[in-house]
A protein has these predicted regions:
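Basic, glycine/lysine-rich polyanion-binding surfaces/domains
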Residues: 1-196
Length: 196
């Protein structure tokens, strides 16, 4: 049974499955999953008109009703990641109402999975993720290797699983830095398979 912070698959819509067996630490590029961002005083109300339930608290996330996730970044900003809903919201927000502002999301999106994730985080980030209660579905805005990131910790296949978003202009640097550390920890890259 899936707990509130446990992903059934990477995309949580049974479309994406891990191909390789996870070793102690793996990295995967999830930038191909469509994203949509919106902010503003009436963003929450506008999302409600689109039948999107939002997390109750700032800096938290929840699953969407049909898969995917929505993160509440602060009070009035939201990040939606889903293969179906995100493109629909992009279209619906081409002419947004007053006090609703679309946010272009061109992030590099990666995930870290494996029992050595915390070891990597200790080397790259000053935030203590071990102190979190992931059952509360936290969204953490911090820096990793000097790059501002948004992080959602969770569990996938009974292992720590961290989704990480960063500005794409810093993506190559962050990937290079993380891959070097992952290599030192005897980890590697993992493949994903999209099921049609």
């Amino acid at each position: 049974m899936r707990t509130s912070n446990s992903f059934s698959t990477i995309g949580d819509v049974n479309e994406i499955q891990i191909v390789d067996n996870v070793t102690q630490l793996e990295i995967v590029d999830l930038s191909f999953i469509p994203r949509f961002g919106v902010k503003g005083e009436l963003a929450e109300a506008w999302l409600a008109t689109q039948s999107i339930a939002v997390p109750d608290f700032p800096n938290s996330w929840c699953f969407l009703s049909k898969g995917g996730i929505i993160a509440r970044l602060g009070t009035n900003e939201f990040l939606i990641e889903d293969r179906t809903i995100a493109p629909q919201l992009i279209t619906a927000c081409k002419s947004p109402p007053a006090k609703v502002y679309p946010v272009l999301r061109q992030d590099l999106v990666i995930a870290l999975i494996g029992f050595q994730v915390n070891e990597l985080l200790l080397q790259t980030c000053s935030f203590n993720f071990q102190a979190l209660s992931i059952t509360e579905n936290p969204v953490i805005l911090t820096s990793m290797a000097g790059v501002n990131v948004t992080v959602i910790p969770g569990v996938l296949q009974e292992q720590p699983f961290y989704r990480i978003w960063c500005d794409c202009t810093f993506g190559a640097y962050l990937l290079q830095t993380l891959n070097a550390i992952i290599s030192e920890l005897n980890g590697g890259a993992i493949a994903v398979k999209t099921l049609l």
